[in-house]
């Protein structure tokens, strides 16, 4: 009986049908980018100072320039270590009193302005930006600055819950295309733009996370199931590269639309176009076969043949899953991930790699917004380096193997973060170059750890293993905002110290995994154990054929 891969070899492994489905699903990957990293623009914190009643009138009466107004009325202006008093405290002075002069108005109140009492910003803030963000609208600064971190953490909590929930729905209840939820992603993106208060914004952000990553994962799985074996690696990498296209588009869109509500609408409304694509993506024939819906699977394979201009094989009606030859099916259990010594080691290492890849990836993106340069250009530069990262993977993965590429990329990202610690604040361009190098390294890690995870687990717990390990990626995204923004307040280089340590340790731990290049996917836990003892690629095996002499007289 032919399998799906056997039929694809005859009707086209990457023909017109697959290309059309690939393009449609890539739109989902593009649309996911603003949700994943939109915090850089939605939560941008501009320079700010306390609003003091009477200052504007006094400045106008005295004819002060902006620099003079700040010098006379804002405490702690100047020294780098005085950011908190400058942005979060005000002089407790009645600026409306007539005794204040225009030349150093505070001189008559105290010999030194540092002796004047300071108070909280009870009248709000003045923000030095022509646009707006959730920070400027809801005053998420000073003592409330942690609420920006919570805003980003909420979407990652949604990723964590939603990816498992939609994965369960896709596997248990409906087909992959039916679980592909761009309509819900669009509906839940629009309320963000009209949220009346901060609490409502958090709720909508959480709900958006529930469906958005599941949408991306469903598309990833679906397109790899439609193409032949020889195209799966390339298609998977290019699907993730479409996410990078979304990053580039986001930087230009954020520059053109500097107001956060309008930006949120701009990135949500185009998802309506995905509704048109939704009807052109059928269910996965592999999933249909696993649900014993062979007739529907055969119809879809026949449709693929017609779209590709090929004739379906004569034995198409006997289409089946390769797994059907197995008479006994094992039931996966969470404990199976830790059942043996090698499997335990691989699981813990992969969990750490998923966690660190998320922390470094999101951390480097958010760190760009805290460096003080051109937010839009810096974001664009760091997004562009993801394209050569995909090219590097396609070029050398089959030549050098998985482990060296995974370990080397982790070490590169960690070393780049370590180097950034010692770069002077005046050399902003050098800091961006180092950040881009680190970003390229961690982008490679993100794509490689997904591949290695799938290749190390035996078949009956492969989906479970990848799901559990990748959930650490979402947990990393939950803590990353707090690590970046709160540690930066202590010392600008402190997040980089942590990122460097995580990346360098991850590089060393990657070498403890077995090489899977050219090795058949393990079917049982016993095969995983043998893989750990001697991870010899199939390409290095030598087969000898012994020809026996023919018996005499024949």
Swiss-Prot record:
Topology class, membrane:
Multi-pass membrane protein
User: Would you list which residues are glycosylated?
Assistant: 71
Q: Which residues carry this modification: Phosphoserine?
A: 333
Record topological domains on the Cytoplasmic side: 1-24, 256-261, 369-376, 424-431, 486-492
User: Which Pfam family name is an example for this entry?
Assistant: Sugar_tr
Membrane-crossing residue ranges in chain numbering = 25-45, 235-255, 262-282, 348-368, 377-397, 403-423, 432-452, 465-485, 493-513
Q: Does the record carry Cell membrane as a key word?
A: yes
Subcellular localization(s) per the UniProt record: Basolateral cell membrane; Apical cell membrane; Lateral cell membrane; Basal cell membrane
Tell me which parts of the chain lie in the Extracellular compartment: 46-234, 283-347, 398-402, 453-464, 514-554
Q: Which GO terms describe its molecular function?
A: (R)-carnitine transmembrane transporter activity; acetylcholine transmembrane transporter activity; monoamine transmembrane transporter activity; neurotransmitter transmembrane transporter activity; organic anion transmembrane transporter activity; organic cation transmembrane transporter activity; prostaglandin transmembrane transporter activity; putrescine transmembrane transporter activity
Q: What is the role of the protein in this entry? A: Electrogenic voltage-dependent transporter that mediates the transport of a variety of organic cations such as endogenous bioactive amines, cationic drugs and xenobiotics. Functions as a pH- and Na(+)-independent, bidirectional transporter. Cation cellular uptake or release is driven by the electrochemical potential (i.e. membrane potential and concentration gradient) and substrate selectivity. Hydrophobicity is a major requirement for recognition in polyvalent substrates and inhibitors.
Query: What else does the entry mention about this protein?
Result: Involved in the uptake of clinically used drugs including diabete treatment medicine metformin, neurotoxins 1-methyl-4-phenylpyridinium (MPP(+)) and iobenguane and platinum-based drug cisplatin. Also involved in metformin efflux transport. Metformin competitively inhibits OCT1-mediated thiamine uptake, leading to a decrease in hepatic steatosis. Plays a role in the anticancer activity of cisplatin and may contribute to antitumor specificity.
| Domain notes per entry | A large substrate binding region with partially overlapping binding domains for structurally different substrates is formed by several transmembrane helix domains (TMH) including TMH 2, 4, 10 and 11, and it is alternatingly exposed to the extracellular or intracellular side during substrate transport. Contains one proline-rich sequence (Pro-Glu-Ser-Pro-Arg) that is required for transport activity.
This protein is called what?
Solute carrier family 22 member 1
Q: Which gene encodes it?
A: SLC22A1
């Amino acid at each position: 009986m032919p399998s799906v891969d056997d039929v694809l070899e005859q009707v086209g492994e990457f023909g017109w049908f697959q290309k059309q489905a690939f393009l449609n699903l890539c739109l989902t990957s593009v649309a996911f980018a603003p949700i994943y990293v939109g915090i850089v623009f939605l939560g941008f914190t501009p320079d700010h100072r306390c609003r003091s009643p009477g200052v504007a009138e006094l400045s106008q009466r005295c004819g002060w320039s902006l620099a003079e107004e700040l010098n006379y009325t804002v405490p702690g202006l100047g020294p780098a270590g005085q950011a908190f008093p400058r942005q979060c405290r005000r002089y407790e002075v009645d600026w409306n009193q007539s005794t204040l002069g225009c030349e150093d108005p505070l001189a008559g109140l105290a010999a030194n302005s540092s002796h004047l009492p300071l108070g909280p910003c009870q009248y709000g803030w003045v923000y030095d930006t022509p646009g707006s963000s959730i920070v400027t609208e809801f005053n998420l600064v000073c003592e409330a600055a942690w609420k920006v971190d919570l805003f980003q953490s909420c979407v990652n909590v949604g990723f964590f819950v939603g990816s498992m929930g939609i994965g369960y729905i896709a596997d248990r209840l409906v087909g992959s295309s039916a679980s592909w939820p761009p309509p819900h992603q669009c509906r839940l993106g629009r309320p963000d733009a009209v949220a009346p208060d901060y609490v409502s914004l958090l709720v909508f952000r959480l709900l958006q996370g529930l469906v958005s990553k599941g949408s991306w994962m469903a598309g990833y799985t679906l397109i790899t199931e439609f193409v032949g074996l020889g195209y799966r690696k390339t298609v998977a990498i290019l699907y993730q590269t479409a996410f990078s296209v979304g990053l580039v588009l986001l930087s230009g869109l954020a520059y053109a639309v500097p107001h956060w509500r309008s930006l949120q609408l701009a990135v949500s409304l185009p998802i309506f176009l995905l509704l048109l694509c939704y009807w052109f993506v059928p269910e996965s024939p592999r999933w249909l076969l696993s649900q014993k819906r062979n007739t529907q699977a055969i119809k879809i394979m026949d449709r693929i043949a017609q779209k590709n201009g090929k004739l379906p094989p004569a034995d198409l009606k006997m289409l089946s899953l390769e797994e059907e030859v197995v008479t006994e099916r094992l039931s996966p259990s969470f404990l199976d991930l830790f059942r043996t010594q090698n499997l335990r080691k691989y699981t813990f290492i992969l969990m750490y790699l998923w966690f660190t890849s998320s922390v470094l990836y999101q951390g480097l993106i958010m760190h760009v917004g805290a460096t003080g340069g051109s937010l839009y250009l810096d974001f664009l530069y760091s997004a562009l380096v993801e394209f050569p990262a995909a090219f590097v993977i396609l070029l050398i993965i089959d030549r050098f193997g998985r482990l060296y590429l995974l370990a080397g990329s982790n070490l590169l990202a960690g070393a780049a973060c370590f180097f950034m610690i010692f770069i002077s604040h005046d050399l902003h361009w050098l800091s961006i170059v180092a950040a881009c190098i680190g970003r390229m390294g961690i982008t490679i890690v993100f794509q490689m750890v997904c591949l290695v995870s799938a290749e190390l687990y035996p078949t009956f717990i492969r989906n479970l293993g990848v799901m559990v390990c990748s959930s650490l990626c979402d947990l990393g995204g939950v803590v990353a905002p707090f690590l970046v923004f709160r540690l930066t307040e202590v010392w600008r280089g402190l997040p980089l110290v942590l990122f460097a340590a995580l990346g360098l340790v991850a590089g060393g731990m990657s070498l403890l995994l077995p090489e899977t290049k050219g090795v058949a996917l393990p079917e049982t836990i016993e095969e995983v154990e043998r893989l750990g003892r001697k991870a010899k690629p199939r390409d290095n095996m030598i087969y000898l054929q012994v020809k026996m002499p023919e018996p005499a007289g024949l």
